[in-house]
Amino acid sequence: MKYMRHFLDFYHHKNTSEIMLLVFCAAVPGICTEIYYFGFGVLFQILLSVFFSVSFEFLVKRLRKQTVKSLFSDNSAAVTGVLIGISLPSLSPWWLSFFGAFFSIVIAKQIYGGLGNNIFNPAMTGYSILLVSFPILMTNWSFQNSSYFNLFDLNNTFSVIFCTDINHYYSLIDEFQMMYKFITQATPLEQIRTHVLDFNNKIDNIFEFVNYNYYFKNWKWISINISFLIGGIVLLGFNVICWRIPVSILFSLYVFFALDYYFFKKSMYYPIMQLFFGSTMFSVFFIATDPVTTSITKIGRIVFGCIVGFLIWLIRSFGNYPDAIAFSILLSNSIVPLIDHYTQPRVYGYVKKK
């Protein structure tokens, strides 16, 4: 007799360590692209976040008198650190990685019982707390005009990240920008939103600004998103993630902004822009697809993705956080039990009454 695989078994036929390793490998194209544009600070942030995440995981397991063997066998803490490091601006001070790892591992993961028991995505929990607590530090991204890096650049990056005095930190940032022609800026969505909210701008000037930013000025963000899209396709190819979540998020996000742009004329952004700016592709493929914090049913995952897409549109259009992805995912995580309750498949062996 031929047996069919269950939906959940199909996407969990690999062990946790293999899944985490594939997630890291799939993120490599995006990481390399960020290093190309943002400098070696990206690598520092990832290494720091991994170190702090693994350290906090080790300490909590020791305090709870649990075996630390799983710490090095499932690699979940290390991957959480990688995701936090990718989310942080490249020249962020080292203590942002420290606090991000603390809130992600200790608060969002271990307090709920560890791997497999957390309600909210750990990496996005830590990131969201940092974003609310330190909005200026978390929204300054430094592009380097030159793609050539040498040891002197590495040393200066190190001195900025590990600076202990916040005033000296900002002075080093200014000096670093002048010396290496760095451009410190907010993300494109934040820039455009600020320009739109400037009521002194006429509507034609706003559209001109949006078009210029989309086609010419911020192609670097587009290439970063494309790199993470490639990594997401790799994860889909190896059946590490389910296609229903990323497809439903991207589809619903595009539909809501297309309606807003073409029919209601309320949005100043091209709908396709929403898919390739900010952390959209990174979050859609590497954050929202976390199997622990998403729905376990086929229909539920589609519903979950559509809710995430709707919340992204809602917050980007009417909220104060233009990227909005972290908050959208966390809010959607909170209603996953409700989604699962109403999307449960029919029990095996149950015969529908005629």
From Swiss-Prot:
Quaternary structure (record): The complex is composed of six subunits: RnfA, RnfB, RnfC, RnfD, RnfE and RnfG.
EC assignment: 7.-.-.-
Family label: Belongs to the NqrB/RnfD family.
UniProt KW keywords: Cell inner membrane, Cell membrane, Electron transport, Flavoprotein, FMN, Membrane, Phosphoprotein, Translocase, Transmembrane, Transmembrane helix, Transport
Subcellular location: Cell inner membrane
InterPro entries for this protein: NqrB/RnfD (IPR004338), RnfD_bac (IPR011303)
Cofactor list: FMN
EC class: translocase
Positions where FMN phosphoryl threonine occurs in the chain: 187
Chain's role: Part of a membrane-bound complex that couples electron transfer with translocation of ions across the membrane.
Spans through the membrane: 19-39, 40-60, 77-99, 119-139, 221-241, 245-265, 268-288, 295-315, 319-339
Record-linked Pfam families: NQR2_RnfD_RnfE
GO CC annotations on file: plasma membrane
Protein name in the entry: Ion-translocating oxidoreductase complex subunit D
Paired cysteines (S-S): none
GO biological process, one term: electron transport chain
Topology in membrane: Multi-pass membrane protein
Origin species: Buchnera aphidicola subsp. Baizongia pistaciae (strain Bp)
Keyword 4Fe-4S: no
